[in-house]
Structure formats: structure tokens, C-alpha cells
Amino acid sequence: MRPYKLPQKALIAEIFNSDDRFRSTTKEVEAVEQERAVIVGMDNDEGYDTLEELNELAKTAGALVVGKVRVRRRTIDNATYVGSGKANELSLMGSELEADLFIFDDELSAIQLRTLEETLGARVIDRTTLILDIFAARATSREGKLQVELAQMRYRLPRLIGQGQVLSRLGGGIGTRGPGEKKLEIDRRRIRRRVFELETELSEIEKQRGLRRESRKANRIPLVALVGYTNAGKSTMLNALTDSNVLAEDKLFATLDPVVRKITLSGGTEALLSDTVGFINKLPHDLVEAFKSTLEEVSNSDLILQVVDISCPYHEKQMRVVDGVLESLHAADIPRIIVFNKADAIPSCDLPAESENRLNVSALCGTGIEKLLSAVELKLNSARTEVDILVPYSKYEAVSMIRDRGMLLSEEHTETGTHIRALLDAESIGQLRKILDF
């Protein structure tokens, strides 16, 4: 029998066998590529397990966590973070566990990075580098990629001093991905030049964002910003509120690029809902700075919905982290509704008491969504004043302005003009006074 004339059954069997061999090889390659990591952090008295959060971050980045080490020290060692004795212990542990990578729960200086890599004989990254790496993997828009690269460059620049050996290992692995990765011979001058290029390009993008913001203000469409700790369920909440299909995953930083959806509330009020990047404990300063233009959407919002994962044992600590970020964005005084999400995941007797500004909701099940929408409309309209006015037909532009900038409650045409009842903000009322001379 000629080799190219196999019976059909044998041919099909061979195809399936080849497919199985390919899948097996792919899994083996993936298993080899998955880095074995040991995570290290300082024990704290905050009642909040930051090391467990670091563990989730490492998994999100694709690492296989093979060891966790909590270190109790009064002060952080300037050279090794954990002290020379503990560093030697970690070196032995890394050898036993065949670790490729050590991830530390706090930012490390250039000296600490260099000393630890020499002592441990493996790659070393810190929490900030890990978070930046996740952002690099998740960024999809042009602006998002530029912002991540800028944050990476700014973070690496002061850590170049005396790090020739460290930088020579930037050829791959967790903490080296994304647009921030450059050739091995990267130096301070090239980084500074690249930072300037990124800042210039992002400045142009920000101008376009500013124009859109001004257009929104001119149309008087209020902006409602969804904020919260990462994985609190903001994207699921946006989908529930707007009946849309934004990607919602049970992962840290599933949403990176901002998403805006328009919604018309039951009373006729139109609003824009914005889903922003999630916050996290020890959020890198360079990341906040790089994403400043995106986060300014929160600062310019008319109402903030702070989404809280009520099922998380550390939700109160997470709320304080979010409060701190909002404070840094000068957004702490913006009207806010606290939305305790995932209320279906805990017994009703354990849910917090509700009030006008604190509601229990399950975005996944839809429980409490209508109540939340009503609260949003009430909040938005509370900043408006009801006007009851007769607009002469000769001043009909006033009617158009009210329709465009306010919420029309009633409109009746009479012999002398149009009788209107509407909700308007202070600026629009001032404009109306100018048109009607009253």
C-alpha cells in the first residue's frame, strides 16, 4: 500500500493522534514557561493579609506560587529588606523549591534589588513591578499602553544605578513584559528620552479627552463614575445598570481601559456611567501619575458610585484604600453612594444597614439594581432646582436651552407663550435669566 493512500479510518485516527500530541506538547511548553515564585512580605498588625493579595497578583501574572514567607521585623533592612540572615534562609528555600523568581510585597530600592539577586541567585521583583506587569498584559487601547509604559519607565529610571546585572536579566519573565520592555543595553539617557516621547504623545491624547469633556459639559450630561477596589464587581455593576456587555471577569484588574456607557433613568434623566481601573493597596505612585488623565474622569464626575465587595473579609480596609486614592485625586468631596455589591454571597442578617447613601446590591443577580438607579437619579436631580416659568414665543431659544441642558417636567403651549416646568442646575438658571432678562 502506498503511504499516501491510507485508509480513511486510519487517516482520521492519525489526525486525532497528532492533535493529542500537539495539545500535550503545548501543555508541556506552558508548564515550562510558568515561573515558580516565592512571595515574601513583612508581617503586619493591620488585620489585613497583604501577602495573600500578593499571592493573587502573582497568579494573575501567570506565576506558580511555590512558597510564602512572612517576615517579622521592626524595621526594613536597607540592603536586603529582610536582613542578611533571612536572605540566606530564602536562598536555601529557593534552591529546595527550584524557584525562578522572588516577589517582595513592598517597593525595593536599587541596592536592595541588586543585593537580593546576588544573594538569592534568582530574579527578584517587587509588588510595584508585578502590578505594572499585569497592567502591561491587560492594556488594550493605545492610551492605556502608553500610560503603562510611562509608569514602567519612571519606575525603572531611579533603579538603574548599580543595576547592570539586574538589567541584563530583563529578557523575559514576569515583571519584564509589556511595552516598557526595551533592549538589554537600555540606559538612563534612552529612558529619559522615551519618557519625554511618551509624555508628549499622552499630552496630545489628553487634549482630545479634554475636548470631549468640554463637549459633555456643554450638553449638561452628568457623569457618574464607578470606583472601587479591584475585583469588587464594577464591570458587572456597569452591565447591570446599563444592560450592556462589558467584559467582567473574576480577576484582579480585569478592566484597565475606561469604559463609558450612556443611560436614561426612569424619570428621563440622562447620564454617562464610567467604569475606571480598580484600586489596590500600595497602588504604585508612578501608575497613578501615568493614569492621571484617565483618573481625572473621576475628579470631574458629578456622582461617584463606590462599589464594595461586601463578601470580602477585608472590605473595610479596602474602603479606606479607595478613600485614600479619591483624596489624592481631589475627589473626596464629590457626592457619593456606597454600593455594597455581592450581597447575595453573605447572609442577609450580616448585611449593613441601608440608607440614602448606602445600598446593598447584587449586580450578578440583579437584586437592588432598580433601587440603586432611583438613588442615582435622586442624587443627580438634588443638584438641580425646579423652575416654573412662562417663556414668550419671541424667546423660544430659552425653551431649546432648557430641553438641552435640563430635565423637562412639563410643557404646555398657551396664548402668550410656553409654560414650562423643568429641573435646571445653577449655571443653566443663570443662562436662562440672561435670555429672559429677569
What annotation goes with each model-predicted range?
Residues 16-29, 48-52, 75-92, 257-258, ...:
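Switch II of P-loop NTPase G domains
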Residues 1-38, 55, 158-232, 238-239, ...:
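C-terminal-of-GTPase-core extension/linker across diverse P-loop GTPases
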Residues 20-22, 209, 216-222, 240-271, ...:
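Switch I (effector-binding) loop of TRAFAC-class P-loop GTPase G-domains
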Residues 43-46, 73-75, 107-110, 129-132, ...:
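Conserved nucleotide-binding/hydrolysis micro-motifs of P-loop NTPases
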Residues 1-131:
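N-terminal accessory targeting/assembly segments
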Residues 39-43, 68-71, 103-105, 306-309, ...:
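Conserved beta-strand segments of the P-loop GTPase G domain that flank and frequently precede/overlap
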Residues 129-150:
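Short alpha-helix plus adjacent loop in nuclease-associated cores
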Residues 26, 51-59, 91-96, 107-122, ...:
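Conserved C-terminal guanine-recognition region of P-loop GTPase G domains, centered on the G4
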